[in-house]
Curated annotation (Swiss-Prot):
Coiled coil segments of this chain: none
PROSITE patterns associated with the record: PRELI_MSF1
Naturally occurring in which organism (per UniProt): Homo sapiens (Human)
Protein name per Swiss-Prot or TrEMBL: PRELI domain-containing protein 2
Lineage, opening ranks: Eukaryota, Metazoa, Chordata, Craniata, Vertebrata
Domain PRELI/MSF1: 1-187
InterPro entries with a match to the protein in the record: PRELI/MSF1_dom (IPR006797), Slowmo/Ups (IPR037365)
Gene Ontology molecular functions: phosphatidic acid transfer activity
Domain of life: Eukaryota
Length: 189
């Protein structure tokens, strides 16, 4: 089945400032779930000017203990051995393509942990707003699918959907705070 989460936000700040804040967003005391972010690869295409980055984020396992125990019990009943939900941290991989000339950045991320049971993918874009060239539009679509755990698929997907929605809103609040701290008040219309 799977669940999707869509986010759309206009930041009243120029593209360059928004992207710089995004790249510095984590770790942040406002979101304790993101423990660290490490750049694994960064390169510039000399012909296009596009900057490619691959980053790995280490995040706390946010699956509630009751769901971890329920799933472990179900897995034991099904004669399968799985302790993957008991891990303290999960890893996310993020790839981004920043095109400074066209003032856009595309981002794709996915979960590296739990791939046997879950698929979590996000696609995001930062781009110059059509409303005002000094503003930046952010569009994100996330999708989670859980498989292999029977009736708990739906329970875990519902939890994941709620967590993703709340996480997206928290991410927007963090971005707004960082932009205001680093760049001052938002630009007027």
């Amino acid at each position: 089945m799977g669940v999707s989460v869509d986010v759309h936000q206009v930041y009243k700040y120029p593209f360059e400032q928004v992207v710089a804040s995004f790249l510095r967003k984590y770790p942040n005391p406002m979101d304790k779930n993101v423990i660290s972010v490490k750049i694994m690869e960064e390169k510039r295409d000399e012909s296009t000017g596009v900057i490619y980055r691959k980053r790995i984020a280490i995040c706390q396992n946010v699956v509630p203990e009751i769901l971890r125990k329920s799933l472990s019990t179900l897995v034991i009943l099904c004669w399968k051995k799985v302790s993957i939900l008991k891990v303290p941290n999960i890893q996310l991989e993020e790839e981004s393509w920043l095109n400074p000339r066209e003032r856009n950045m595309a981002i794709r991320s996915h979960c590296l942990t739990w791939t046997q049971y879950a698929s979590m993918k996000e696609e995001s874009v930062f781009r110059e707003s059509m409303e005002n060239p000094n503003w930046t539009e952010f569009i994100q679509r996330g999708r989670i699918s859980i498989t292999g755990v029977g009736f708990l698929n739906c329970v875990l997907e519902t939890f994941a959907s709620t967590f993703l929605r709340q996480g997206a809103q928290k991410g927007i609040r963090i971005m707004e705070m960082l932009l205001k701290e680093q760049c001052g008040a938002p630009l007027a219309e």
